[in-house]
Amino acid sequence: MFFRISTVFVVALAAFAAASPAPWGAPPPTTTTHPPVTTTVTVTAPATTTTIPASQCNTGDAQCCNSVQSATAPAVTSLLGLLGIVLEDINVLVGLSCDPISVIGVGGGANCVQQPVCCENNNFNGLINIGCTPINIFL
């Protein structure tokens, strides 16, 4: 008699354990996925990178960037990947952490301690500017 009760108890306990998928008090797991967002940017690079006067910056605003690197640099490719930006031409310069500078106030109003560049209107809130060309703000 004791053997039958023990067997029924063990079978019932195993069935109960198999029927409860989540730990006590934990909500069932939910998985939400969002489709990836990809931004494609077309930038044409100059044949050679030359320094141009700030007054000739006609492809966009003059920017003062903390860093200007090739699009193939590891830090730049990581950032482009995180932002979902795909470049069609990887032979371009990319400005990182850029702020607009005033070309009108050459001298005092155009202070840029880092790298002054002219970019092709492909900026992402100053975090990254694509298609940059170095400029000389003192010409």
Curated annotation (Swiss-Prot):
| GO cellular component term of the entry, any | fungal-type cell wall
In terms of InterPro entries, this protein maps to: Hydrophobin
Q: Where is the signal peptide?
A: 1-21
Primary site of residence:
secreted
Factors inducing expression: Expression is low during in vitro infection of pine seedlings.
Which terms are listed as keywords in the entry?
Cell wall, Disulfide bond, Secreted, Signal
| Disulfide cysteine pairs (residue numbers) | C57-C118, C64-C112, C65-C98, C119-C132
Tell me the GO molecular function terms: structural constituent of cell wall
User: What is the annotated localization of this protein?
Assistant: Secreted; Secreted, Cell wall
Q: Is-annotated flag, keyword Electron transport?
A: no
Q: Which Pfam families match?
A: Hydrophobin (PF01185)
Spell out the subunit comment: Self-assembles to form functional amyloid fibrils called rodlets. Self-assembly into fibrillar rodlets occurs spontaneously at hydrophobic:hydrophilic interfaces and the rodlets further associate laterally to form amphipathic monolayers.
Say what the protein does.
Aerial growth, conidiation, and dispersal of filamentous fungi in the environment rely upon a capability of their secreting small amphipathic proteins called hydrophobins (HPBs) with low sequence identity. Class I can self-assemble into an outermost layer of rodlet bundles on aerial cell surfaces, conferring cellular hydrophobicity that supports fungal growth, development and dispersal; whereas Class II form highly ordered films at water-air interfaces through intermolecular interactions but contribute nothing to the rodlet structure.
Return the similarity comment: Belongs to the fungal hydrophobin family.
Annotated protein name in UniProt: Class I hydrophobin 1
